Amino acid sequence: MIKEKTNSTLTFEDFKIEVLKDYTTAIISRECSLLGRKEVLTGKAKFGIFGDGKEVPQLAMAKAFQNGDFRSGYYRDQTFMMAIGELTMQQFFAGLYGHTDIEQDPMSAGRQMGGHFATHSLNADGSWKDLTKQKNSSSDISPTAGQMPRLLGLAQASKIYRNVKGIPNAANFSNQGNEIAWGTIGNASTSEGLFFETINAAGVLQVPMVMSVWDDEYGISVHARHQTTKENISEILKGYQKEEDTNGYEILRVKGWDYAELITTYQKAAQIARENHIPVLIHVNELTQPQGHSSSGSHERYKNSDRLAWEREFDCIRQMRLWMIAINIASPEEIDAIDAQAKKDVMEAKKAAWNAFLEPIIADQKALVALLNEIAATSEHKEAITNYANELNAIKSPLKKEILVTARKVLRLIVAESGKAVLANWINEYTQKEQKNFSSNLFSETEKNVFSAQKVLPVYADDAKEDTDGRMILRDNFDAIFTKYPETLIFGEDAGAIGDVNQGLEGMQEKYGELRVADVGIREATILGQGIGMALRGLRPIAEIQYLDYLLYAIQIMSDDLATLQYRTVGKQKAPLIIRTRGHRLEGIWHSGSPMGMIINAVRGIHVLVPRNMTQAAGFYNSLLECDEPALVIECLNGYRLKEKMPSNYGEFKTPIGVIETLKTGNDITLVSYGSTLRLVQQAAKELSEVGIDCEIIDLQSLLPFDINQDIVKSIQKTNRLLVIDEDVPGGASAFILQQIIEQQDAYAYLDSKPQTLTAKAHRPAYGTDGDYFSKPSAEDIFEKVYDMMHESNPALYPSLY
């Protein structure tokens, strides 16, 4: 066991001031929770989830939390955020109301429900702030235990900064690796696999992580006996306890109502983690939930009278009050005065937040009412329009929706009248303004977004031949990347010692060390989380998921956390993580999947790149490292030994993102595909040319973003026919591709035949060469599909094959 140092002694007067300050923060937080619930139940807010019953341990955590540290927590941590000075009473209520002004609700500008916290890591131009000079919180998400994988990466970043030299601007992100990543989770959520995966990984990596489990014995209405073996998470994690000459954890237990012991425990945990990079788990038990889980219900429904009586007695604020009286910190009357002032201050903050939320909406309401009355004066529908205006004007607390609904309904009435233009213009301007409030920042809006990367062609020697294994091009390009960007690192299953399963990292660990080129365990979700957390702290991680089929283990974190990060923080945080994987065709159900439809529909907010060969893939990595956005790069699993030309400008050539490439020009039909399937398309096109069919072949290269220059429709204007070839299931990625071409690019007007798709079968691909042939599109399938489309247009020239 590791012993903590003794802290310097405060005078009693200093101690008293500190305790009273803490108590004031706790009681303010409690009053916010109580009043917040009332605001929901009276209809002013939609939903509330609060931190009541967890206030006192969060005070202790805040005392140990230093500048540069990061929090990765969940929706109970309002007291902590108040204690570190990152949440005011008025901001608390602004979040509850969903105020779309980032100044009023700095957590998410109303995009997340209240209780989801974040600090701002970026300046207005998207550049990094000095994170060592502020207390940091990564942005919360609701999915239970979803904060855990990211926590691992936040902690690992400190280890990287402590041990890897030469990282540019490291001093803005770390003070020699002394930062702690602080995690919080409810006891019930420790049942999630993400919790155990993270706990195990942090124990292996030995990173400075302090994990607090807030234990009130319930998960919504479900008691711990249904959640946790032995009803005690620290008991069942005993095997992780660090012993001499082993890795592992320090595991501490403390009662959530014992203020003094909580302070001691958190100071001890911080010292262990900060100085020694040993993870610590603090099991904070005997906590309560005075209002139940959320505003959706009451805990009286599932707790008996004895439990409710115990919760009233051992409410952490009540116990802190009794302790303060017992040691003469304050008299009951003095504490009552603090309580009364807190109630008054919270009420005033609530009113200020509500007025700030409502005033701009009322201004828009009045502006529209005035406009409608003006239009009504000369309209054939004066009575109806006046009624709409009066009904809108009568709403005391209008919603933006109600304003726009009224305007749009009136527009229908006056579609043939002179007032239409001014109202339509008002609607368009209002919609544009408000849509930005709700829809901006899905992707980066800075000058370093992916569209800033300019195409740089590979440079080849005059006598270059296609005689180099594709994997060697990747290897040599990664070598150039690791030299050029000291902040880059790559990690994954088999990525280290053997240089990945396809030798694309051959020799890299030996050259750059085990921290920058690392093997990890079989745990895809936390591989992804490592990348998110380190990217949040200024590093440029490349997280390798060994096969595309295994991405499903990580897809929830990709979808819920990484993909939404810039959106849910309104561009105030970023994690430019590169996810490297390999997929499409190889062997059998579990090593030849191409679930692209699932992926692209789950990860909007992450770019999805599908290079056809390793030169294109290497170019994507080079492009992405100049940008500030996350991306998934899917290398072709069956392409590592295929021959390509060897470039001479490794680390410099760049594949443009969102730009298609025409591999073959033609006049009869446009064939659109990507990845491994393109080689079959090229083979089929060659055979089709022998029967007089001239195909144009387009490599998408990128699914998200999709053909930003709208070049595909230009091809269709020439060929008037379209076939999308995809090895995903029917209606998978091919449906998205078709929607983009037909709807977004308006290609329908140029088609002489119906657009068609050729996809894999609905089942997973079967094993073996024959299994592949009967599961996924073959060259013969492509030939016959194209031939049939041409037969439809000219049966005489192209007689039916069957």
Describe the predicted segments one by one.
Residues 1-46, 67, 75, 446-457, ...:
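Cofactor-/ligand-binding subdomain signature composed of acidic, glycine-rich
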Residues 31-212, 217-219, 223-241, 246, ...:
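Cofactor-binding active-site loop characterized by glycine-rich and histidine/acidic residues
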Residues 55-59, 136-403, 637-802, ...:
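Thiamine diphosphate
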Residues 68-72, 135, 148-149, 179-183, ...:
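Structural motif
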Residues 128-138, 146, 421-459, 604-608, ...:
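Helix-enriched interaction subdomains in cytosolic or periplasmic regions
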Residues 382-530, 535-537, 549:
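Non-catalytic terminal/interface segments that mediate subunit docking, oligomerization
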Residues 573, 583-587, 591, 596, ...:
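Active-site phosphate/pyrophosphate-binding segments
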